[in-house]
UniProtKB/Swiss-Prot annotation:
Protein name per Swiss-Prot or TrEMBL: Methylthioribose-1-phosphate isomerase
Metabolic or biological pathway, per its Swiss-Prot or TrEMBL entry: Amino-acid biosynthesis; L-methionine biosynthesis via salvage pathway; L-methionine from S-methyl-5-thio-alpha-D-ribose 1-phosphate: step 1/6
Key words, A-Z: Amino-acid biosynthesis, Isomerase, Methionine biosynthesis
Annotated GO biological process: L-methionine salvage from methylthioadenosine
Name of the top EC class for this enzyme: isomerase
Swiss-Prot/TrEMBL catalytic activity: 5-(methylsulfanyl)-alpha-D-ribose 1-phosphate = 5-(methylsulfanyl)-D-ribulose 1-phosphate
Family the entry assigns: Belongs to the eIF-2B alpha/beta/delta subunits family. MtnA subfamily.
The enzyme's E.C. designation: 5.3.1.23
Gene Ontology MF terms: S-methyl-5-thioribose-1-phosphate isomerase activity
Gene3D superfamilies for this protein: translation initiation factor eif-2b, domain 1, Translation initiation factor eif-2b, domain 2
Role played: Catalyzes the interconversion of methylthioribose-1-phosphate (MTR-1-P) into methylthioribulose-1-phosphate (MTRu-1-P).
Pfam families listed in its UniProt record: IF-2B
Gene: mtnA
Active site: 239
Length: 355
């Protein structure tokens, strides 16, 4: 079965945006229609849509959808409302930089419009372009990543950096889909990824849909699995990469990087250029989202911890650059000296700017 059997995470429908409800997977495949800016915000904030690229795509469509309904012919008023709504959507989640990148790209695209109608058309076209480009970007990331693995290799991953977290293919999971297309055998060991279980619910599900060999383990089995199963490499996605290569990704990623160092196996980060934030100099500058305690104290709505227990629930951690063997982007594989090599990937126009 090809990756194209995996449902798309986001679709533009002219009058609304349709998303795959990732909170209901794997037991229920449910689509939700988002009709308002508030619908889009809520879908992002509550993880109905998740994965840095998919968040960016959804936010871009949400901003374009809102702008289509502005009842003004004044460009100044149009831009004021656009900036207001951009800021509102940007507040949905603080860590994933693709959210801000996509929203700012739309605002910039509409800046030179000579009329409100032209601005509205430009916003829709730019949002669609972001999704189309992301599919190509993910495939190129996958091709580069695939070159790093030997046929038959066993590779570990955490969270879900797959097809449903992007336009298609994913980032960290892209090489496994391409390997399947090319008849190359690779095996994936997927961590369940507490507390929201993206690995168990999403990664295991979508890899199985595509016929990729996947084994699910709990997070605290990682070290034993590396030793007992001969894991040859670890590959993860990213929500934000600082200029020096420090990488924010799902909580537990830092621990995996430490394990990779201990076992002397490579630790790879797979991400598009849009996830690299040159305005963030080091990982210390990356805001770490903390989420509701119920994610830790409940599973599938059932309480598993005592009432009133203290909970610490950071959604992400930051892996220091010295633990990262290479960062895999659509432009190639970058190894070390990230302060110099990451900026060199960008043209001036591609660099992140805060709008």
């Amino acid at each position: 079965m090809s990756t194209f059997a995996i449902p798309r995470s986001v679709e533009w429908r002219e009058t609304h945006v349709t998303i795959l409800n990732q909170q209901k997977l794997p037991s229920i495949i449910e689509y939700i229609d988002l009709h308002t800016l508030e619908d889009v915000y809520e879908a992002i904030a509550t993880l109905k849509v998740r994965g840095a690229p998919a968040i960016g795509i959804t936010a871009a469509y949400g901003l374009a959808l809102a702008a289509l309904r502005y009842d003004t012919e004044s460009l100044d008023e149009f831009r004021r409302r656009l900036k207001r709504d951009r800021d509102y959507l940007a507040s949905a989640r603080p860590t994933a930089v693709n959210l801000f990148w996509a929203l700012d790209r739309l605002v910039t695209a509409a800046a030179d419009a000579l009329s409100v109608n032209e601005a509205k058309t430009t916003l829709v076209h730019e949002a669609i372009r972001i999704q189309v480009e992301d599919e190509d970007v993910c495939r190129r990331i996958g091709e580069h990543a695939l070159s790093l693995f030997r046929p038959g290799e066993r590779v570990m991953t955490i969270c879900n950096a797959g097809s449903i977290a992007t336009a298609r293919y994913g980032t960290a999971l892209a090489p496994f889909y391409l390997a399947k297309e090319k008849g190359i055998e690779l095996s994936v060991y997927a961590l369940e990824t507490r507390p929201v279980l993206q690995g168990a619910r999403l990664t295991a599900w979508e890899l199985m849909q595509a016929g990729v060999d996947v084994t699910l383990i709990t997070d605290n089995m990682a070290a034993q699995a590396i030793k007992a199963k001969g894991i040859g490499a670890i590959i993860v996605g990213a929500d934000r990469i600082a200029q020096n290569g420090d990488t924010a990704n799902k909580i537990g990623t830092f621990g995996l990087a430490l394990l990779a160092k201990s076992f002397d196996i490579p630790f790879y980060v797979a991400a598009p250029l849009s996830t690299i934030d040159l305005t963030t100099k080091t990982g210390a500058d990356i805001p770490i989202e903390e989420r509701h305690p119920d994610e830790v104290t409940h599973i599938a709505g059932v309480r598993i911890a005592p009432e009133g227990v203290n909970v610490y629930n950071p959604a992400f951690d930051v892996t220091p650059n010295e633990l990262i063997t290479a960062i895999i982007t659509e432009k190639g594989i970058i190894r070390g000296n990230y302060n110099a090599t990451l900026p060199s990937l960008f043209t001036k126009e591609e660099q992140h700017e805060t709008i």
